[in-house]
């Protein structure tokens, strides 16, 4: 009998498409049957035909849509739609759901039984989407990776030992047993390392009634990264509390701690840890404190050239005050530390009061303020003034007493740096006036104000040009004389970034206190008058600086609107 008569439909199509010769096709078909594999899987594993070629051919021949799995956000796959047993048995994967219709990825278009079984099991209308077989296998493994999978080799992470808080001995021993559970140790280590590698700033470990989830804040946005079994909740919490030196038996009150992770022989990263009792257990949030972020240099922060020169000039002044303002998470600490690093030489005495100290810097005297123990910002400032300081940094000006001491220091031969939670440079000045700071003292002590936000940077690998009508550009505030001289880009998403953005860049309003602004302050002018004068003197506000970043192709207009529009 002729070999070609023995060929299945797919084998015949491969021969007709010159992807296989007849002899190889017959042998592959027989080998797949012996190994109890689908022909598609055998061909890909044997490297006889690529997964992409098979998918494209099958899509054309069977009239089924093809989709590249790597272009999809695998975190959004409806994992619970199909049981793991059924997924692995039929080698299918749930991609997305629309109403009562479930779309599943398959690599073998002839596997009609898979679609029938999925439809029967879920009660949903099921539509097949062709995907590449090699990518399908990886995606299935990733989808059902459990809390203890893929963690081998992480036990050797060097976590500095910390004493456990004084708890009841029996409770302590029970909790310690939970905390030392090997799979939990590996899972926690993996989460910490993944957060560091992904450039995340915060980790959230969150218990709920029926689920436990872990989320990372990356580039300012929270996203879910893991859903370990709910049964691991108490053990994960115990492990994190042991590492942070917290009292494991205390589950009714918030606690604060710290973890130091050594990621190489020369580099370690600190995590600030906070626990919060919730309805379903303790939520734990960790802030990553990477000292290298404060040593990137001013050029890496995103200042426009004229803004950078204003900051550097202010740092060279022998006395006065530099204020950095913005909401929580806007990068104020990094801006301050960057300035302190520039000033950190052997002939300058620098002291800082912080709540808490986030980044340890050699050569700088850093103090943790703790009002409950009698050390608040104002008391730290008074102590600094008796320590022969050149530069003083106050983590935040929160009250009139701290503001008055800081201003007095700035007027008596010291450089003072601090932050406020205000929206703009103009609002910073009026906030201090409203606190009760005398207008004359404020006008003569403040040298520079920096208001800032952090915007996500477009991924350079996948950003695409975005056409925007002229009327829209004018409405958004782009300069009329610049329209037509620049291109705007929008996010796409690729393997490098996942969502179209990678990293963040600062958007700044840098205002020098000029004689004209001093007059308005001494007359106790409002924020509108101050902002108008700053614009007249050529200082870009946050909105204008953000539009410049969009015109330069660094970020998108949508992102500028997100961080600068009230």
Swiss-Prot record:
Residues that, per the record, bind Zn(2+): 459, 462, 494, 497
Gene disruption: observed consequences: Mutants fail to make pili although synthesize wild-type levels of the pilin subunit PilA.
Keywords: ATP-binding, Cytoplasm, Fimbrium biogenesis, Metal-binding, Nucleotide-binding, Protein transport, Transport, Zinc
Main location group: cytoplasm
GO molecular function, a single term: ATP hydrolysis activity
Effect of residue 414 to A: Loss of twitching motility
Organism superkingdom: Bacteria
Binding site for ATP: 326-333
GO CC entries: cytoplasm; plasma membrane
Annotated phenotype, changing residue 146 to N: In strain: PAK
Sequence similarity: Belongs to the GSP E family.
Protein's job: ATPase component of the type IV pilus (T4P) that plays a role in surface and host cell adhesion, colonization, biofilm maturation, virulence, and twitching, a form of surface-associated motility facilitated by cycles of extension, adhesion, and retraction of T4P fibers. Acts as a molecular motor to provide the energy that is required for biogenesis of the pilus and the extrusion of substrates generated in the cytoplasm. PilB ATPase activity is also essential for T4P extension while antagonist PilT ATPase activity is required for T4P retraction.
Domain remarks in the Swiss-Prot or TrEMBL record: The ATP-binding site is essential for assembly of pili.
NCBIfam families in the record: type_IV_pilB
Subunit text: Homohexamer. Interacts with PilC. Interacts with FimX; this interaction positively regulates T4P assembly and twitching motility by promoting the activity of the PilB ATPase.
Protein name per the record: Type IV pilus assembly ATPase PilB
Organism: Pseudomonas aeruginosa (strain ATCC 15692 / DSM 22644 / CIP 104116 / JCM 14847 / LMG 12228 / 1C / PRS 101 / PAO1)
Gene designation per UniProt: pilB
